[in-house]
Amino acid sequence: MSAITYRIGNDLDLDLVIELYRSSTLGERRPIGDRARMQCMLQNASLVVTAWDAEQLVGITRSVSDFAYCTYLSDLAVRCTHQRRGIGRELIRRTREAGGQATVVLLSAPNAVEYYPHVGFTQHPSAWVLPPDRAGDSR
């Protein structure tokens, strides 16, 4: 196994990104069957950090940031074969570093709730979500 290298930038082969999402289980919660939407998600992210094992994409963080106050970490994915090696922790560290003084905020996948306290996150009790299909719905 070679050393993991890290890069910043969103100029990535979409097929590699989709394949990574599939192999990390994040694909279960992302529109990987909609290439145009996935491309838009990738290109409009203001901060993307990737992890590479030689030429294989093994991890990614995809964030939206103002680089001053808030960085929303939209996606954290690490290939299942490469988990439990500190790659996720390092991707988060590099995302935080690149985000300047911004606070990193995320919504956890249900199966990852126990992970985030181990990498320095504290749970916030008053987060709210408004999905696109509920906008303006008064129910």
Where are these regions (language model features)?
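Conserved GNAT acetyl-CoA-binding A-motif
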Residues: 97-110
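Conserved acetyl-CoA-binding loop-helix of GNAT-fold acetyltransferases
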Residues: 78, 84-97
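Short amphipathic alpha-helix that is part of the acyltransferase structural core
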Residues: 1-35, 127, 137-139
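Conserved catalytic-core motifs of GNAT/GCN5-like acyltransferases
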Residues: 105-107, 117, 122-139
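Residue-level recognition of the GNAT/N-acetyltransferase active site
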Residues: 9, 79, 109
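A conserved beta-strand-loop-helix scaffold within acyl/acetyltransferase catalytic domains
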Residues: 31-32, 36-76
